[in-house]
Amino acid sequence: MRIQQVESFILHVPVTGKQIADSTHSISHWGVVGARITGEDGTVGYGFTGTHAHLPSDQLITRCIDTCLAPLLVGENALETERLWWRLARQPALQWVGRAGITTLAHAAVDVALWDLRAKALNMPLWQLLGGAVREEVRAYNTDIGWLSLSDDALLRGAQQAVDEGFTGIKIKVGSTVARDLQRLRAVRRAIGDTITLAIDGNGKWDLNDSLRFCQAAEASDVFWYEEPLWYDAVRAHAQLAHATRIPLALGEQLYSVDAFAEFIAQQAVHWLQPDVTRMAGITEVLRVIELAGAHRLPVAPHAGDMSQVHQHLNFSRTPCAVLEYIPWIRECFEEPIRVVDGHYQRPQQPGASTTPTPQAWERYRRATS
């Protein structure tokens, strides 16, 4: 099937609770910045990257899709996802400006759209195209209850509500002060008991010394993992922390290539890998990370930059993908939204990658691409 047209789009969707914050960001909307690819038979594939809904930077991504990537795709065989991935990745002018940032986010949207189109053309959900299901359901952990912007009371209420809804894992944000975050961590652990897994996420705010201080005191709270404890590409510092604490380290949402993950693994600086199809040039590159993880017997927990619309298919079809983040901000924007029952993702049934926006979302949240 030949590619007939490639178009970009932008949706800005409100987050839960109007405004949320972690240790480094405060946002009111999530950006769904993507590509719509039409095949010669009329089949349409959708893919997107996730942003903080900053229109000028979102328009840099759509401009890259429309002016740099689209000309390389029109007329090509849409089903040849691997070849087209390399065609875009090795385009000399794009390679010169860098294999990260804007060009890679644009590439991610296009790659996901191609996989969506391919699965639709074959009339099967993406997880089936990827080899079929390896599990009946996927364990979810709830992040939406744990923002730093929440009061202590709201944090505890949200944690208890998540447990009541069947979630067996939750994650809370840290990165304000060591003392305050230890207090919140201990309060949540007391509230939810010992049988619920409790992860923390620093979003890279603290330095090595603060992270070491925090971990020394936090180990008693049975922390499932400490996510992004340090600046995202500080491999040596992560290795030092990993060797100094019993808390497993998780990272990867800001890594752009399988090579970056390989370096963290080589330095024994990570225990949980968290690739994101919206940041890593799409599904094609994330599959390579999952293969790498499997070879090293490391678990994978994809980061929900796509709010898990796409990643759920990877969790269902790949053994290393053990758990999956739950943030419900954009779920109602899609024809087949993520579905979580008693704290577990249920298998998508419609053909494709679960990335087709509803007409209502298109009308309500669409923004200009230039």
Mark where each language-model region is.
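N-terminal amphipathic alpha-helix/helix-capping segment at the start of soluble metabolic enzymes
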Residues: M1-R2, F9, K120, M124-E136, ...
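Metal- or metallocofactor-binding catalytic centers and their adjacent structured scaffolds
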Residues: Q5, T38-A121
